[in-house]
Amino acid sequence: MAKLLQPSPKFLPEEWHIANKNQYHRAEAQRSRSERLVAESQRLVDEIEKTTRKSQSDVNKKLEQRLEEVRFWKKELDDKLEQLVCTTEDLLTYQTRLQNALESLKEPLHITQMCLEYRDKRIGIDLVHDEVEQELLKEAEVIHGVMALLTRTMDEVTEQIRLNRSAKYNLEKDLKDKFVALTIDDVCFSLNNNSPGIYYSDSVVRVEPHSVSLEDWLDFSNTNVEKANRQRNNSLALKALVDRILSQTADDLRRQCDMVDTAFQMGLKETKAARDQLAAHLAKVMEEIACQEKNMTVLEKAILDQEGPAKVAHTRLETRTRRPNVELCRDVAQYRLVKEVGEIAQNVGRLKEALAQAQVELKGLNRRQLALQEEVQVKENTIYIDRVLCTHMRKSNPLRDGGDQGQWARACAPTPSAEDGTSHTD
C-alpha cells in the first residue's frame, strides 16, 4: 500500500523543454499537413465544380443537339406522312374511278350482247357472219379485255394502298416514339440543380438491353422515310399509269364503237339496196305473171277458135264421102280438105304445147314470186333488227361520242391531285 502511494517521478527541465518542443513540432507538422490538405481540398473542390459545370454544360449542349436532331427527323417524318396521306387519298379516288369505269362497262357489254342475240334472230340467207357481226364480236372482246385490264389495275391500286398504309403505320409509330422522346429530352434539358423533383436513382448508369446505337436509330428513321418515298413514287407512277390506261381504253372502246356503228350503217345500206332490188325484181315478176296469164288466155282462145274451122273441115270431108259412084273422086278439093284437117290439128297441137309451156312458166313465175316475197320479208326482218332494235338501242351506249352519254367520260376523266392544291372531284 505504501508503494502504491509513491509520488510520480519528476522530469528534468531539459526533458520539459524537449517535450514542449516536440509538441510544437508535431503541432506545426500537423497544422502544415492540414493546411496543405485544406488547400488541396479547395483546389479539388474548385476543379470538380468546374468539371461538373463543364460536364453539365456539355450534357445540356448534347441534349439540345439531340432535341434538334429529333425535331429534324420528326419534321421529315411529318412531311413524308402528309405527302403519303395525300397520295393515298388520291389512290382511293383512282380506285373509285376504276370501279366506276368497270361498272360503266356493264351497259355497253349488255348492249353488244343483246345486239348479237337480236341478230341471231335473222332468218334465211341473212343469218350471215357479216362485217356487223364481226365488229360486234370484236367489240365484246375489246370490252372483256378492257374489263380484265381495269380489274388487274384496280388490284395493283389496292395493293399499293395497302403498302402505303403499311408505310404510314411505320411513320406514325416512329413519330409517336419521337414525340415521347422529345417530351422526355425536353424535360431533361430543362432540369437544373435547383429543379424540384430531382433525385438519386439506383443502377441508373447502365445500358438498357433493348437500346439501339445511334447508327441503328438513324437507319431506322431513314428506312421509314425511304420506304415512304418509295411508296409515294410508286403511287405517283401508278396514278400516271391509271390515267394512261383509262384514256387509252376509252379511245379503244370509242373507236370500236364507231366501227360497229359504221358497220351497221353500211350493212343497213347494203340490205336496203338488196331489198329494193328484190322488190324491183318482184314487181317485174308480177308484171310478167300478168303477161303470162294474158298469154295463156290468148292461147286458150286461139285453141277454141280452131274448133270452128276443124269442124267445118271434118264436116266437109264427111259430107263429100256421100258422093255417088265415080263422083267419089279424090279430087284437088278432097286433098286440100285432108291437108286442112291435118294443118288444123297440127296448129292446135302447137297451141296446146305453147299453152303447156306457158303454164310451166307461170308456175315458175309464181314460185319465184313467193321466193322473192320471202326474201323481201327476210330483208325487212334484218332491217328491223339492225335499225329498230340494234341501232336504236346503241344510241344509249355510253361509249358513243356526244349526246348526254357522259358516264364513261366522267369515269375516265383525270382527277386533280391534292398535291397540286386542288380538291378531289370525281
Curated annotation (Swiss-Prot):
Cellular component GO terms, alphabetical: axonemal A tubule inner sheath; axonemal microtubule; microtubule cytoskeleton; sperm flagellum
Positions in coiled-coil regions: 21-84, 268-307, 339-383
Primary location group: cytoplasm
Region (Disordered) location: 396-426
Pfam families per the UniProt record, alphabetical: Tektin
A single GO BP: cilium assembly
Record note on modification: Ubiquitinated, leading to its degradation. Deubiquitinated by USP16, promoting its stability.
Sorted UniProt keywords: Cell projection, Cilium, Coiled coil, Cytoplasm, Cytoskeleton, Flagellum, Microtubule, Ubl conjugation
InterPro entries assigned to the protein according to its UniProt record, in alphabetical order: Tektin-like (IPR048256), Tektins (IPR000435)
Keyword Cytoplasm: yes
Record's subcellular location: Cytoplasm, Cytoskeleton, Cilium axoneme; Cytoplasm, Cytoskeleton, Flagellum axoneme
Record's function text: Microtubule inner protein (MIP) part of the dynein-decorated doublet microtubules (DMTs) in cilia and flagellar axoneme. Forms filamentous polymers in the walls of ciliary and flagellar microtubules.
Protein family per UniProt: Belongs to the tektin family.
Assembly with partners or alone: Microtubule inner protein component of sperm flagellar doublet microtubules.
PANTHER family, per database record: TEKTIN, TEKTIN-1
Protein name: Tektin-1
Encoding gene (name): TEKT1
